[in-house]
Amino acid sequence: MLQTLHDYFWWERLWLPVNLTWADLEDRDGRVYAKASDLYITLPLALLFLIIRYFFELYVATPLAALLNVKEKTRLRAPPNPTLEHFYMTSGKQPKQADVELLSRQSGLSGRQVERWFRRRRNQDRPSLLKKFREASWRFTFYLIAFIAGTAVIVDKPWFYDLRKVWEGYPIQSIIPSQYWYYMIELSFYWSLLFSIASDVKRKDFKEQIIHHVATIILISFSWFANYVRAGTLIMALHDSSDYLLESAKMFNYAGWKNTCNNIFIVFAIVFIITRLVILPFWILHCTLVYPLELYPAFFGYYFFNFMMGVLQLLHIFWAYLILRMAHKFITGKVVEDERSDREETESSEGEEAAAGGGAKNRPLANGHPILNNNHRKND
């Protein structure tokens, strides 16, 4: 049965145009073609990425955070309380008013004390500012290097300037070492993101992030073994062109450099809109939807690839909506911050705020820093 499933999955009619077989993509005459077995290396490489990330965050990102004066807000810990802890772990982190009244009677605390305990307990579970900074630093470093390397891989190729050449001779298109390593490294990195997503900072778009990582892994993998490599390199470079800007904006936001953060964010928003909502759908998707049909009849692989591209495009539209919301806040005089962030709650008691080192007393906090409006910002 397993052999039958294997044979059906790798049936040429699913993944290749009519009258072509996998034998046509076997290495010959010094020409090397993409093969599914090439992708096996990406799993150990993903584990290597996790190891490199650990040491990068420890020996590069942490000193950089200190250099940029990334400071933690002192958090008041919730005192031990078995009754409230049991409710927090089993019933929810946001008790309703009726729950607060019941817990007040069970614990012998006032309703206000119960609410304060849950605020502190939720804050304990939120990631620290240093953790956020280190994570953003790692992603910034990778995306910047990947964008530079990816651009170097494609900038001298004829299909970079004429998209019809993406399909010239398809699928009998040999690959070169730079394409191989670009693919393996990108795919390995996204595997590492998927492996670490449970321990990384969780944002409001957590489910969308999982969908994005899975869709990206499927797209990169399929485009490799079906030899959509030329289109794949264009798509990966296009995606990397804006991601490093977002991560750098986050880094400066966590460091409290609001002017720098806002300026980089505006650049990111422009690049994101142009690349994800203009170039990708009207050039790249047009290239993958229209041009192949001029060469051969549509087949399953054609539909599958473009369906997954459609999934990514829907995510781009969703994220563009969040970006435009943040841009609107910036234009209307509110500090830009990541709409996906899980914001830390503040204590309502003045005495507690003072005990926490209330230099930011009576001022709202975002990411552990007092929010600075456009009329009073930290100088860059």
From Swiss-Prot:
Transmembrane segments: 41-61, 140-160, 181-201, 209-229, 264-284, 304-324
Positions bearing carbohydrate: 19
Cytoplasmic membrane side: 325-380
Residue ranges occupied by any TLC domain in the UniProt entry: 131-332
Pfam hit, one: TRAM_LAG1_CLN8
Biased composition (Acidic residues): 344-353
Annotated membrane topology: Multi-pass membrane protein
Region (Disordered): 338-380
Major subcellular location class: endoplasmic reticulum
Subcellular location(s) per record: Endoplasmic reticulum membrane
Reactions that this protein is recorded to catalyse: a very long-chain fatty acyl-CoA + a sphingoid base = an N-(very-long-chain fatty acyl)-sphingoid base + CoA + H(+); docosanoyl-CoA + sphinganine = N-docosanoylsphinganine + CoA + H(+); tetracosanoyl-CoA + sphinganine = N-tetracosanoylsphinganine + CoA + H(+); hexacosanoyl-CoA + sphinganine = N-hexacosanoylsphinganine + CoA + H(+)
Modified residue annotations for Phosphothreonine: 346
Gene Ontology, cellular component aspect: endoplasmic reticulum; endoplasmic reticulum membrane
Annotated keywords: Acetylation, Endoplasmic reticulum, Glycoprotein, Lipid biosynthesis, Lipid metabolism, Membrane, Phosphoprotein, Transferase, Transmembrane, Transmembrane helix
GO molecular function terms attached to this record: DNA binding; sphingosine N-acyltransferase activity
Homeobox-like as annotated region, ranges: 67-128
Phosphoserine PTM positions: 341, 348-349
PTM comment, free text: Acetylated. Deacetylation by SIRT3 increases enzyme activity and promotes mitochondrial ceramide accumulation.
Gene3D superfamilies linked to this entry: Homeodomain-like
Free-text note on domains in this protein's UniProt record: The last loop motif confers selectivity toward behenoyl-CoA (docosanoyl-CoA; C22:0-CoA) and lignoceroyl-CoA (tetracosanoyl-CoA; C24:0-CoA) as acyl donors. The predicted Homeobox domain (Homeobox-like region) lacks important residues for DNA-binding. Moreover, the protein localizes to the endoplasmic reticulum membrane, strongly suggesting that it does not constitute a canonical homeobox domain.
Subunit and partners: Interacts with ATP6V0C, ASGR1, ASGR2 and SLC22A1/OCT1. Interacts with ELOV1, HSD17B12 and TECR. Interacts with NDUFS2.
Role noted for this protein: Ceramide synthase that catalyzes the transfer of the acyl chain from acyl-CoA to a sphingoid base, with high selectivity toward very-long-chain fatty acyl-CoA (chain length C22-C27). N-acylates sphinganine and sphingosine bases to form dihydroceramides and ceramides in de novo synthesis and salvage pathways, respectively. Plays a non-redundant role in the synthesis of ceramides with very-long-chain fatty acids in kidney, liver and brain. Regulates the abundance of myelin-specific sphingolipids galactosylceramide and sulfatide that affects myelin sheath architecture and motor neuron functions.
Protein name from the UniProt record: Ceramide synthase 2
Species name: Bos taurus (Bovine)
